[in-house]
UniProtKB/Swiss-Prot annotation:
Residues 12-19 are annotated as: G1. CDD domains: AIG1. Gene3D superfamilies: P-loop containing nucleotide triphosphate hydrolases. Residues 170-172 are annotated as: G5. PROSITE patterns: G_AIG1. Belongs to the TRAFAC class TrmE-Era-EngA-EngB-Septin-like GTPase superfamily. AIG1/Toc34/Toc159-like paraseptin GTPase family. IAN subfamily. Residues 61-64 are annotated as: G3. Induction: Up-regulated by brassinolides. Down-regulated by 2-aminoethoxyvinylglycine (AVG), high CO(2), isoxaben, and propiconazole treatments. Residues 173-308 form a coiled coil. This is Immune-associated nucleotide-binding protein 10. Expressed in radicles of the germinating seeds. It comes from the Eukaryota. The gene is IAN10. Residues 131-134 are annotated as: G4.
Length: 463
């Protein structure tokens, strides 16, 4: 019976000790390892070792995933080589980090690049290996002490996604017993990966994903070239059309200048003729007529003008209580550089909103209607009872106009946005002008209702 083979892939940023970790696993120096900024590993390399009382391991070292001096296409090609080397599939991926310093943004980029190349499922096969165990030992620290000093959010997430699998390595140790124990701990994590993934190595999904990404990249390059050629052709055609349009506009402009000059000359002659024929009496009549027209126009404008009473100027029961009502800035008034405040009902049993208006300032002999401007949100609740809408004259003399009252089912307005609800009408005849009041209320049902926004009251002419 042949010994089981485990394919282990090393990934990480240059300088974190990938190659040294590989040599520790193999028990002999096979991978080149130097302490320098530029990566030593430029291509994927694989070496094999038989672990005593354990499996045969194939250790595959890869280029630094975030090395700026290694082109992206080269990294993709080397990943394909890595898969070719791992014939039986990848059994574990060692994400090599250094415990000698703080985790940097480059480490986060390494994890992101790893997921982009292999897919997010690769974290199911990941084991986080921290090198620099000798430094922690000199400082009399453990790996847990290192984490307590501060663990970046992204690393916490990575450890959680890979089942918390982590191990500390001292690649400089000369203690053979310690070396064997390190490798034993790591292989235990590899076995845990197998248990969590059902013993299925990461291979077929990788081949298919990389092939699809390569094909998609080629198709994207073809689309870019095709789009560029099409854009250049469209640009050339557009430039030609613009040139022709420019010539056409220049010709029309010259023609229009001639017509304008002729029209100005004709207008000048006609004006001279009109000035000579006008008489003083006719001019006076024209001025009187103009004044009359302006006066009538101003009356119409006054009659057509709408009046808006904002929510802040209304009497809203319990509006002083933040438990029942909330004041919210809504629209921005550009002319006054202010915000329009609206009142949002959070919940109240006694619902009463009222106000008043002096009609002596309104246009005479005009028919007006009074409308509450409200918004019943989708989440409005407990509006089963009808709401009373009232319009009445305040301090009216005996025999004057009476109170107008109507009931409104507010449920029909839920979710309809801003709506106007009719409260009543009045006509500004000489005998009816004065102070009028209006009210929207419901105080009998005992329901605790909410979800209503009051913007104000609109008074406008009825055509």
């Amino acid at each position: 019976m042949s010994e089981p083979i485990k394919n282990i892939v090393l990934v990480g940023r240059t300088g974190n000790g990938k190659s040294s970790t590989g040599n520790t696993l193999l028990g002999t120096k096979q991978f080149k390892s130097k302490n320098q900024a530029k990566g030593v590993t430029m291509i994927c390399e694989m070496y094999r070792a038989a672990i005593q009382d354990g499996p045969i391991i194939n250790v595959i070292d890869t280029p630094g995933l975030c090395d700026s001096f290694v082109p992206g296409d080269d990294i993709s090609n080397e990943i394909i080589n890595c898969l070719t080397m791992a014939e039986e599939g990848i059994h574990a991926v060692l994400l090599v980090l250094s415990a000698r310093g703080r985790i940097s943004k480059e480490e986060e980029s390494t994890v992101n690049t790893l997921q982009c190349i292999f897919g997010s499922q690769i974290l199911d096969y990941c084991i986080v290996v921290f090198t620099g165990g000798d430094d922690l030992e000199e400082d009399d620290q453990t790996l847990d002490d290192y984490f307590r000093a501060g663990c970046p959010e992204f690393l916490t997430k990575v450890l959680r996604l890979c089942g918390g699998r982590k191990v500390l390595f001292d690649n400089k140790s000369k203690d053979e017993k310690k070396k064997v124990e390190q490798v034993k701990q790591l292989l235990a994590r590899v076995e845990n990966v197998g248990e969590q993934t059902g013993g299925i190595p990461y291979t077929y999904q990788l081949h298919r994903k990389i092939k699809e990404e390569n094909d998609e990249r080629l198709r994207e390059e073809e689309r870019v070239i095709e789009s560029k050629n099409r854009a250049e052709a469209e640009l050339a055609e557009m430039q030609q059309n613009l040139l022709m349009e420019k010539e056409k506009l220049q010709m029309e402009e010259a023609k229009n200048k001639q017509l304008i000059a002729q029209a100005e000359a004709n207008e000048k002659l006609m004006e001279q003729e009109r000035a000579k024929n006008r008489a003083e009496t006719e001019l006076a009549a024209v001025m009187v007529e103009k004044l009359q027209m302006e006066e009538e126009k101003n009356k119409q404008l006054i009659a057509q003008a709408n009046r808006m009473i904002c929510a802040r100027d209304l009497n809203i029961e319990w509006s002083h209580s933040e438990e029942h009502w909330k004041w919210v800035n809504l629209d921005h008034n550009i002319s006054s550089n202010t915000f329009v405040e609206v009142a949002e009902l959070l919940g109240v049993y006694w619902f009463d909103v009222s106000g008043s208006l002096d009609t002596t300032e309104m246009a005479p002999w005009t028919h007006y209607e009074v409308l509450f401007v409200v918004n019943l949100k989708d989440s409005a609740f407990k509006w089963n009872a009808a709401v009373k809408m009232n319009l009445f004259y305040i301090n009216s003399r005996p025999g004057g106009p009476g109170t107008q009252e109507r009931a409104v089912d507010m449920r029909q307005h839920i979710g309809k946005g801003w709506v106007t609800i009719h409260a009543g009408e009045f006509i500004t005849t000489p005998e009816n002008v004065g102070l009028i009041g209006f009210r929207m209320s419901e105080v009998d049902s005992g329901d605790n209702r909410g979800g209503l926004i009051v913007k104000g009251v609109l008074i406008r002419p009825i055509n």
